[in-house]
Amino acid sequence: LILGGGSNFLFTEDFDGTVLYPLMSGIEIVDENQDEVWVRVGAGVVWDDFVAWAVEHGYGGVENLSLIPGHVGAAPVQNIGAYGVEAKDTLCRVEVIDLEKACKVTIEAADCRLAYRNSIFKQEWKNKYVVTYVVFCLDKQPVFKLGYGSIRQELEKTGEQLGLKQIREAVIRIRKAKLPEVSEVPSAGSFFKNPVVAEVIGR
């Protein structure tokens, strides 16, 4: 069993087996140009710590994903998403260890078959690879994604100038209002999938 932060996992009984728990740390810039920056993040980094780092440095693309629980290594596996943004929007490549061949492999985002809360890591490659590092491509001149109604409404309440920090804080307020602190009200969290229907039905 490969386990990250433990979100989206609910054990109903003891697990009698081996658990792999990636602890790779670190956030480093590996390349950049005038408009974009490529950031390599350890699989063991808490996801929201990475988002906070990106916002602090003025890099856009993941601010809408603030306060999502779990570790960075799970981002490409689950293709995490919220408020109109998904991991696939910024994912560049994934560094893994092939458990069968005991070697390092780099997988491009295009080969991860990223879909709504899904990827090839949850299908054919389940338990085949352990994610060690993930490389994201972030924007130096971010375009804010405010299509999700509640974010825009929350921002209008404060009247502050629009920026990465303000969007992150708005998302955090929204998420905290929906679910109490686990330390106060213990729970398995909130995990769900919206139904996917044909476009003709959606109309």
Segments the model singles out, each with a brief description of its role:
Residues 104-203:
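Phosphate/pyrophosphate- and phosphate-bearing ligand-binding catalytic cores of soluble enzymes
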Residues 1-100:
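Anion-binding (especially nucleotide phosphate/pyrophosphate-binding) glycine-rich loop
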